[in-house]
Amino acid sequence: MSTQFSLSSNISYDDPISFECDTSYDSGLELLKYIIQVTLLSINFILNFLIIRVTMFSKNNDFRENSFFIIYAADLIMGMYMSLSEILVGRLFIYVTLLCPILAPYFFTPSIFLKIFFTLSHYSQGFKTVSQVFLSFNRMTCVVFPVGYSAIWKRILTPIIIVLFVLPIGIIWNVLISRVYANPSFGGFSVNYIKLVSWASLSKLHLTYFIVSLILIIVISGVTLYALLILKHRIKSAEQTLTIATMVLSLEFSFLSVIQIYFAFFSSSTSEWRPFLLRVMYFTYDLLNFSTTIIFISCNPKLRKMLLKRMQSSVTVGRSTSNSTIPVRIIPALIH
């Protein structure tokens, strides 16, 4: 049975919001979609965990004391949260349709659990957006100011970490004061909200962050690439890596911006596109998390060697880090 869902215009904060689950979806097919997505999310979670383990918990201090990897570790931890929360809550509620009639009634009234999940989901998305700018900026300073790089970041790292954690609040502040509720989504249910401040929609706020971040990443990466090109001894592998990383991020941010434009300005008038674009948005966020991790590993032989040795459990991390001839300080300038 396909169901229609709409909210009353005069609903209060505490009123129950009930719905019937859409039983027209094939539960087996939806479960298969869940398994495929969970597989990708799980791989990303494991890779992020391994990177943190071999960089931040190794016997070698090069990674732990490097400003780039400190910022990147925060980015990885946020990526791990995004993957885990989607596996255990977000995608589970949407695609495991047999759970919908069992669990949905528990969320017809205001739920602290849903509010925390929804708020942290959008906070982490905003965090990932902002972190890419600071990682790009770190790479740029390493190339442009090679002598003073360490001293510069010793002074500004703490303020930047604080700003990194504070800026995403600019996306979720309206959610914090608004009603969060469950609504039918595909064969299961997802989480939405009733805006208390009508103009401050999540889609518009995300769109603003995407556009500003995209512009900054392109400008910063352009400066970095130019600085690499004018080096007396050019590092062509670094130039190629930086170009690829910038292109991938730019395409993903541009794609997410287009989707947010739809949700911000056209969703109500062309609702037949909404289910499709929701799926595309979920996939694009997964791809953003996964692609940055893969690019980072594939373009960093030092880290790749450490990960392989860690997984093989054949040598210690400390010994594996001693084989590289490239100073770790240069790594942030070369890859992400």
Curated annotation (Swiss-Prot):
PANTHER family per record: SERPENTINE RECEPTOR CLASS GAMMA-RELATED
Protein name: Serpentine receptor class gamma-13
Family from the record: Belongs to the nematode receptor-like protein srg family.
UniProt cross-references to Pfam families, sorted A to Z: Srg
Listed GO MF terms: transmembrane signaling receptor activity
GO biological process, one term: sensory perception of chemical stimulus
Species of the source: Caenorhabditis elegans
Residue ranges the record marks as coiled coil: none
